[in-house]
Curated annotation (Swiss-Prot), chains A, B:
GO biological process, one term: sucrose catabolic process
Active site: D59
PROSITE patterns, alphabetized: GLYCOSYL_HYDROL_F32
GO molecular function: sucrose alpha-glucosidase activity
Signal peptide from the UniProt entry: 1-14
Record's protein name: Invertase
Catalytic activity: Hydrolysis of terminal non-reducing beta-D-fructofuranoside residues in beta-D-fructofuranosides
Length: 609, 609
C-alpha cells in the first residue's frame, strides 16, 4: 500500500520562541519534578526489544542457544520488586524461538543473601561435562553452567550455578566461589570454549573478567570451569572512562567486499556453518531473513585498497574482538562501549592496531554480550542494554525500566572512514523475524523526489503501531550550498495522538553529519533531566560514492536504532512520548531548494499484537 | 561586598510542559529559521576571550612571545569580509601585554590568489638566522618566521613567510613551497626548536604536520626551515574521527604532589625559568598571578602511589605531549581534541601508554596550539578555538563569529581517575590578569550552607557585566539517597534582563556526575539547531577524599570554561542569550534535603570596559 500526500505548509518567518516556563517559579517546578505520577510516564513499552513486564533490568547475561529445543535464552540483571536497581539483584530469564518475540520466565536464580547481588556473567554449555555437574540424564546440548559475580559485603567473587532442566532452574555450586582475588571490583565473567588452532589441542575454557577500577580485563583459563589460571591481562587500553565493565572476547568473521543482498536483517538460520575464510553471503531463503523484495537494499561495500593490517585478516578470515564497556566518563555522557580488533592465541589478546573504536555512537548501548553456541558457527550475535547509567533509574516508564537492544549479527569489515582511507570496523546487522513482522503490516514508499523548501511530503501510517522499519537513500548536490545556512534534509517522526511530540532525524550538508533530536516531547523527564542528551549526531560517510548516503532504522515505541552506511556506524537511542502516542507519520522536508534528492524512502510498519 | 538573599519560592508540582511550538506549522518555521535577523542574534561578545570585531575566525595560528617588546602575539584563520568561513582565508593578528586584553591588528598576511587559503600554521623565532631571512637590523628576539599551509586548487603545501617588523607585516619566501607531497590534505605545520639531550648537539627545527585523511602526523626535521627531511610518522593512534588536524608536539613539565597555592590562574611571568626536573611551585607575587587572598583554593593533589609509567616522568621531570585535533566524528558530535603522553627523541614520538585521552570534554575546544618562546621556559601555554565545526558558521553572533578559549598553562600531573587508580593527565590552568580584573569588580560568597528542597539561595550581582569567575566546593552525604530520585545540586546562572534565559550547572549524587544545560535560551539557534548539544556532562571525581568536590569556572558573556578537580578535567562550552542579557544572579538549589553542603561558593564579578 502506498500513501503519498503533499501538503502545502504555511512558512512562518523565523521567530523567537518564548519559553514561558523558564522563569523562577518554573525553575522551582523542575526541582520538584522527580515524582512518577502516571501522567508524566510513557507507557510505550517496546514490542520487539525485550523488556520485563515489571521491575528493573540492566545488563544482558548468560546468552545461549539451546540446539535441542531450538530456543534462544537470555538472562539479565533483574530486580523484580520495583522499577529501579536494588538488592537482592537476581538473574531474570526469557526465551525466544525467533529472537523477536520473547517469553518471560521470571527469576532464574539469585544470591543467597538479601543484601547481595547476583551480578553479571555468562553461560556455557558443558557438552563434555568437564565440570562434573552432569550425568547422562542431561542432554549434552543442555548442560548449562552459569558463571556469575557475587557482590556481597564489599567483595566480588566468581561463582558457578548449573541447570539440569535446560536453563530454567539452577543449583549453586557448593564450593563457590571459584575465583576470589580479594577485590571489591572484580566482575562480569564471560566464558567461552577455546579449541586452539592445533588439531591435537584438547581445548579449554577461557574467561575474561573485569578488574573494573584498575581498567584491567583479566584472562583466565580452566579445564573444568572450577579451577582457573590467570594467563594475562589486557589493561588500560583505549578510552578508560571511570571503570571497565562487561568485557568479552569473541572470534568474528572478516567479510571483504561483500554484497549484503539480504542486509540489514541477516539470515541467522542458514543450514550448516559458513566457512570462516570464504566470502560470506547471506541466504535470502530463510524464514527470518530480510525480505529483499519488500525493501531492497542492494548496497555494495567499496573495492578500495585494503590497509596493511587487513592482509592478516584476509588470510585467516576472522579477527578476535575484545569488547569493553566503560562507565561513567563517556564524552557523550555516562556509559559507553568500545572494542579492539586483534588476535588471541589462547592466553593473550593483542590488538592489531592502536585505534580506539566506539561501538554504537548513541547514548543507549551498554554491556554488550554475545551468545554462546550460535547454530551457524560463524554468526556472532549479541545484545546490549539499551540505556545509560546516567539516567537509567529515572527514565519515565512504569512498571518496568529498561529494554534490551535488538540482537545484532557482527562481522569485521573495512569501510571508508573518509574518502582516502579505509579502516576495519565491527559491522552490525539487526536480526529479527522480518518476514513475519512485515506480513500483516503496511508499507509506504517515496521515490525519486527532489526536495525544495516550499513544500513537504507526508507518509501517514494506517493504524499506527509505533513499530516500523525505514530505509532512506538520498543524494546530495553540494554545489552552491552556503556554509552559513543550515542545509538540512529532515524527517519528522510525528506522534499520531499528539503531534507536539516528534523525533527529528536528518542530515546537514555543510557538516556532512546526521542528527537525531529526541527532545520534542511533553514528558517532564525529557524536558528537564540534564543527562538526557536530546541532540545526537554521527558523521555519515557515503556508502559507495561521494554524493549518495543511506540510513536504515528500526523504531519500536520508545527506542530507535539507526544503521548508517549498511551497518558500519550505528546509533541506538531511547525516546519518550506520552502514553499511547505512537509515531503516526513521517514528514519529509528540506529548508533549502534542490540540494536533496530522495532516491527512496521505504517504510514497513510492523503488525504487532 | 557580600550579598546573600534567601527567597522562598513557590514549589509547583511536576507539570507537563506543553510546547505549543511543536506542531506542523511550527515545524515549518524551523525549516525557515536560518536567517540572521538581528532580533535572533546574540551580541554578547566575550570580553576576556579573544574575538575579532568583525568577520570569521577559526584556528589559532602562529602563537609567539616577543621578549624584546614583552608582547604576546596571536594569529588566526580569518575571513574579514563576512561572519562565515570564506576565501581568500587570511591570518588575522592580535597583540596583548597580559593575555587578557587583546589589541586587534587586522590581516597579517594572506594567500596570493583570491580562491586560495592561508591555512593554519605556526611561527618561530629564528634567533640564529638559520633561514637567512634576516640581518643584524632585526633584533634576534623578533626574527619571526611563519610556517603555514597554502590551500589552492586542490593542493596543500607548506609555505614560509617572514617579518622584519616584529610580526606586523610579512614577506612570502620566494622559493615557496618548502614542502609539497602532492596531497590535497597536508596541513597545519607546527614547528619548534629541538636542542637535543646531548650538550654538543647543534639542534634543529622539528615540524609536525597532518596528512589529515590518512590520520598521520608527519614529523620532519630541518636545519634552516627551508629544507625538510621526513623522520617518522605518528599514525592511526587513539580516536580517529574523520580527519586529523592541527597536530602539535610539546615538552610539558611533570608536576607531582604539588600544592597549587596559586591555581587556577597560574603565574606566567615569574622571573627566571623553573628547572624542569624540580617540583614546580607557582609564585604568588606576580602581577598577573591568581590572587590567593580573594578566592583561596588550597587544593592538594593526592599522595596516592604512582603507577609504573610515571616513574620515568619523575626521573626526567617532563613528558612530551602530542596534541591531535579530529573533525568530525566525535561521539559528542563534530570536532574534538585528544592528546598522547610520551617521549620524543628528536625524530620519533612514542606514547608511554595505550590510553586515549580527550582534552576538554566540552563541545567547543578545538585546534589547540601552544606558544613558541614563553618567557618562563617550562610554561606550556596554549589557546584553542572555542567552537565546533558542526555549527561554527551558524552560531548567532554578529558581526563576528567565534572566539578563542582562554590561554591555559598545561602541566602533566597524575590524578585519581577513580578511587583505586591514578592516571596521568594534561592539567589545565586558566591564565588571565586576575588581579586587574578583580580590582574594580564585586565579590559574593556563600559558606557552610546545608541545602534543602524547600528554600534556595540567590547571589545577585550588582551591575551585571556578564564576566565573572566562581569557585564552588561542596560535600555530598551519600547516605540514604535513592537511585530513582534525581538528586541534584543545581546552580542556575540567570539572565539579568530576561530570566527565561539561564545556564543550569550542577551535580547529581547517584551518577556522581556534573552537568551543564545550555538549552534555556530564547535564541532560535539554541532552540532549533540539532547540532547545538544543549546538555553536557562530565564525571567529576573528588579532589582529595570521597565526599568533597570542587569546580572552578569562568563565565564570559557567551562562553563558560569549567575546571574540575583543580584542572584535571575541563569542559568549555559556548552559550547564547539574547543581546544584552548578562548573567545577573546565581540561584543555588537542591531538589533533596540534607544531601549537599556548600562548603564555599565564591564569586568575583570582573569589571570590564
Amino acid at each position: 500500500m502506498l500513501k503519498l500526500l503533499s501538503l502545502m505548509v504555511p512558512l512562518a518567518s523565523a521567530a523567537v520562541i518564548h519559553r514561558r516556563d523558564a522563569n523562577i517559579s518554573a525553575i522551582a517546578s523542575e526541582w520538584n519534578s522527580t515524582s512518577n505520577s502516571s501522567s508524566s510516564l510513557s507507557l510505550n513499552r517496546p514490542a520487539v526489544h525485550y523488556s520485563p513486564e515489571e521491575g528493573w533490568m540492566n545488563d544482558p547475561n548468560g546468552l545461549w542457544y539451546d540446539a535441542k529445543e531450538e530456543d534462544w535464552h537470555i538472562y539479565y540483571q533483574y530486580y523484580p520488586d520495583a522499577p529501579h536497581w536494588g538488592l537482592p539483584l537476581t538473574w531474570g530469564h526469557a526465551v525466544s524461538k525467533d529472537l523477536t518475540v520473547w517469553d518471560e520466565q521470571g527469576v532464574a536464580f539469585g544470591p543467597e543473601f538479601e543484601t547481595a547481588g547476583a551480578f553479571s556473567g555468562s553461560m556455557v554449555i558443558d557438552y563434555n561435562n568437564t565440570s562434573g555437574f552432569f550425568n547422562s540424564s542431561t542432554d549434552p546440548r543442555q548442560r548449562v553452567v552459569a558463571i556469575w559475580t557475587l557482590d556481597y559485603s564489599g567483595s566480588e567473587t566468581q561463582q558457578l550455578s548449573y541447570s539440569h532442566d535446560g536453563g530454567y532452574t539452577f543449583t549453586e555450586y557448593s564450593d563457590n566461589p571459584v575465583l576470589d582475588i580479594d577485590s571489591d571490583a572484580f566482575r562480569d565473567p564471560k566464558v567461552f570454549w577455546y579449541q586452539g588452532e592445533d588439531s591435537e589441542s584438547e581445548g579449554n575454557w577461557v574467561m575474561t573478567v573485569a578488574e573494573a577500577d584498575r581498567f584491567s580485563v583479566l584472562i583466565y583459563s580452566s579445564p573444568d570451569l572450577k579451577n582457573w589460571t590467570l594467563e594475562s591481562n589486557f589493561s588500560r587500553e583505549g578510552y578508560l572512562g571511570y571503570n571497565y565493565e562487561c568485557p568479552g572476547l569473541v572470534k568474528v568473521p572478516y567479510v571483504k567486499n561483500t554484497t549484503y543482498a539480504s542486509a540489514p536483517g541477516s539470515n541467522i538460520t542458514s543450514s550448516g556453518p559458513l566457512h570462516p575464510n570464504s566470502t560470506v553471503s547471506f541466504s535470502n531463503s530463510s524464514s527470518i531473513a530480510w525480505n529483499a523484495s519488500s525493501v531492497p537494499l542492494n548496497i555494495t561495500l567499496s573495492n578500495s585498497t585494503l590497509v596493511d593490517e587487513t592482509s592478516q585478516l584476509e588470510e585467516v578470515g576472522y579477527a578476535w574482538v575484545m569488547i569493553v564497556s566503560f562507565n561513567p566518563g563517556s564524552i557523550l555522557g555516562g556509559s559507553g562501549t568500545e572494542y579492539f580488533i586483534g588476535d588471541f592465541n589462547g592466553t593473550h589478546f593483542e590488538p592489531l592496531d592502536k585505534q580506539t573504536r566506539f561501538l554504537d555512537l548513541g547514548k543507549d548501548y551498554y554491556a554488550l554480550q554475545t551468545f554462546f553456541n550460535t547454530p551457524n558457527e560463524v554468526d556472532v550475535l549479541g545484545i546490549a542494554w539499551a540505556s545509560n547509567w546516567q539516567y537509567a533509574n529515572q527514565v519515565p516508564t512504569d512498571p518496568w525500566r529498561s529494554s534490551m537492544s535488538l540482537v545484532r549479527n557482527f562481522t569485521i569489515t573495512e569501510y571508508n572512514i573518509n574518502s582516502n582511507t579505509t579502516a576495519l570496523v565491527l559491522n552490525s546487522q539487526p536480526v529479527l523475524d522480518f518476514t513475519s513482522l512485515r506480513k500483516n503490516g503496511t508499507s509506504y514508499t517515496l521515490e525519486n523526489l527532489t526536495l525544495n523548501s516550499s513544500s513537504h511530503e507526508v507518509l501517514e501510517f494506517e493504524d499506527p503501531t509505533g513499530v516500523f522499519e525505514f530505509s532512506l537513500e538520498y543524494s546530495v548536490n553540494f554545489t552552491g550550498i552556503h556554509n552559513w545556512v543550515f542545509t538540512d534534509l529532515s524527517l519528522y517522526f510525528q506522534g499520531d495522538k499528539d503531534s507536539d511530540e516528534y523525533l527529528r532525524l536528518g542530515y546537514e550538508a555543510n557538516s556532512k553529519q546526521f542528527f537525531l533530536d529526541r527532545g520534542h516531547s511533553n514528558i517532564p523527564f525529557v524536558q528537564e533531566n540534564p543527562f538526557f542528551t536530546q541532540r545526537l549526531s554521527v558523521s555519515n560517510p557515503p556508502s559507495s560514492n561521494s554524493s549518495t548516503f543511506d540510513v536504515y532504522g528500526i523504531v519500536d515505541r520508545n527506542i530507535i536504532e539507526l544503521y548508517f552506511n549498511n551497518g558500519t556506524v550505528t546509533s541506538t537511542n531511547t525516546f519518550f512520548f506520552s502514553t499511547g502516542n505512537n509515531i503516526g507519520s513521517i514528514i519529509v522536508k528540506s529548508g533549502v531548494d534542490d540540494v536533496y534528492e530522495i532516491e527512496s524512502l521505504k517504510v514497513n510498519q510492523f503488525y504487532v499484537d
